[in-house]
């Protein structure tokens, strides 16, 4: 199995709900290591740039507004098949359709405020990690 890195964002609803620790525990319990982390309050430019691929979609403005409504926690997770594992832990985009025990089922209130973001492919992970982190902000954890 391949060791991968993926980007995770704990969104404003989950940060505001005081769920950071519980969400981090889920990552670590699944064998993912946190190798980079920071709390940010995104502005329109940073959030809009991150979600630029959705610019023409009808939900884009609401998404940017939500992502700038409060602090987020961006993290780089590392582990075997980290991308798929992280997506499994997150659950379906719509919390109403998410499996029991997933982050979205337990901490999200709607498809619009769904607690977390995760990279959907190796290409996305590489691009998204570079968007928020410089090389020296992502650390090797050998211990």
Curated annotation (Swiss-Prot):
<feature type="binding site">
    <location>
        <position position="87"/>
    </location>
    <ligand>
        <name>ATP</name>
    </ligand>
</feature>
<dbReference type="GO" id="GO:0004550">
    <property type="term" value="F:nucleoside diphosphate kinase activity"/>
</dbReference>
<feature type="binding site">
    <location>
        <position position="93"/>
    </location>
    <ligand>
        <name>ATP</name>
    </ligand>
</feature>
<keyword id="KW-0546">Nucleotide metabolism</keyword>
<comment type="subunit">
    <text>Homotetramer.</text>
</comment>
<dbReference type="GO" id="GO:0006228">
    <property type="term" value="P:UTP biosynthetic process"/>
</dbReference>
<dbReference type="GO" id="GO:0005524">
    <property type="term" value="F:ATP binding"/>
</dbReference>
<dbReference type="GO" id="GO:0006183">
    <property type="term" value="P:GTP biosynthetic process"/>
</dbReference>
<dbReference type="InterPro" id="IPR034907">
    <property type="entry name" value="NDK-like_dom"/>
</dbReference>
<feature type="binding site">
    <location>
        <position position="11"/>
    </location>
    <ligand>
        <name>ATP</name>
    </ligand>
</feature>
<dbReference type="InterPro" id="IPR036850">
    <property type="entry name" value="NDK-like_dom_sf"/>
</dbReference>
<protein>
    <recommendedName>
        <fullName>Nucleoside diphosphate kinase</fullName>
        <ecNumber>2.7.4.6</ecNumber>
    </recommendedName>
</protein>
<keyword id="KW-0460">Magnesium</keyword>
<comment type="function">
    <text>Major role in the synthesis of nucleoside triphosphates other than ATP. The ATP gamma phosphate is transferred to the NDP beta phosphate via a ping-pong mechanism, using a phosphorylated active-site intermediate.</text>
</comment>
<feature type="active site" description="Pros-phosphohistidine intermediate">
    <location>
        <position position="117"/>
    </location>
</feature>
<keyword id="KW-0597">Phosphoprotein</keyword>
<dbReference type="GO" id="GO:0046872">
    <property type="term" value="F:metal ion binding"/>
</dbReference>
<feature type="binding site">
    <location>
        <position position="104"/>
    </location>
    <ligand>
        <name>ATP</name>
    </ligand>
</feature>
<feature type="binding site">
    <location>
        <position position="114"/>
    </location>
    <ligand>
        <name>ATP</name>
    </ligand>
</feature>
<feature type="binding site">
    <location>
        <position position="59"/>
    </location>
    <ligand>
        <name>ATP</name>
    </ligand>
</feature>
<keyword id="KW-0418">Kinase</keyword>
<dbReference type="GO" id="GO:0005737">
    <property type="term" value="C:cytoplasm"/>
</dbReference>
<dbReference type="InterPro" id="IPR001564">
    <property type="entry name" value="Nucleoside_diP_kinase"/>
</dbReference>
<keyword id="KW-0963">Cytoplasm</keyword>
<keyword id="KW-0808">Transferase</keyword>
<dbReference type="Pfam" id="PF00334">
    <property type="entry name" value="NDK"/>
</dbReference>
<keyword id="KW-0067">ATP-binding</keyword>
<comment type="similarity">
    <text>Belongs to the NDK family.</text>
</comment>
<keyword id="KW-0479">Metal-binding</keyword>
<keyword id="KW-0547">Nucleotide-binding</keyword>
<dbReference type="GO" id="GO:0006241">
    <property type="term" value="P:CTP biosynthetic process"/>
</dbReference>
